[in-house]
């Protein structure tokens, strides 16, 4: 079944266009295995006067609205017709956004072919499986970019990371993982396509070791991060290097975005003065007191379920 390449792929590309300076998802995107039932749409349409302020955020709100409408249109169709109906509805809703995205978010256009290849090639042969795989991939792509852009207007409240459940003392490592990831993503973006995964993993391990003062030699010393990565790309571990890197980066993107949001929410203004007064002491002893990865476990579980 043919896909209208530059219509459908545009919205998968949304999750692939931001560089490390704007988000962690440069060239990131992955295609989970087909689900037994169609995936739940990534988010609800934004209400009038939503919180989106940038062109990219506003575009994402429109994408989510069109996505939900297309899923709803296919919901009651026979399994063999679901993909065709979804594609037609989604393409129709996107017509008015193509020109807008080209003018206001020009970085999308160069990513269209890559987005199409990563998403559509993962679709199964049968129409039923193709629909599930495609919608699941699109759902995950939208959730990744929603977190990266912090478009809370298109993210249900139930999907927010609840920092109150995370012990304050265990938030210390978040900034260190975040910094290490940015260093690694920047290094990987400059590497040839087939080398991205190797460069990213090596750079991330090195940066994590340096940022934590040797407390964590590699990301594999944080079991929950390693488990999340394995879970995310288990089905595609033998895929092409560029796909493996995209999956790896997307998994860590979601985890670190969750931890960063939790960290911000866990620092009330009333405690700002106290926190500032203890920064020097904390920095001097960080390597010795880095907490166990319970924070990573909690925030990662939340994100893998809800993003």
From Swiss-Prot:
Transmembrane feature ranges: none
Lineage: superkingdom: Eukaryota
Statement: the UniProt record of this protein carries the keyword RNA-binding: no
UniProt feature coiled coil, ranges: none
Annotated CDD domains: Allergen_V_VI
Tissue/organ expression: Pollen, starch granules.
Keywords from the UniProt entry: Allergen, Signal
Pfam families (UniProt xref): Pollen_allerg_2
KW Magnesium (keyword) present: no
SUPFAM superfamilies: Group V grass pollen allergen (SSF81736)
Signal sequence segment: 1-25
InterPro entries to which the protein is assigned, alphabetical: Poa_pIX/Phl_pVI, Pollen_allergen/Os
Family: Belongs to the Poa p IX/Phl p VI allergen family.
Protein known as: Major pollen allergen Lol p 5a
Originating organism: Lolium perenne
Primary gene name: LOLPIB
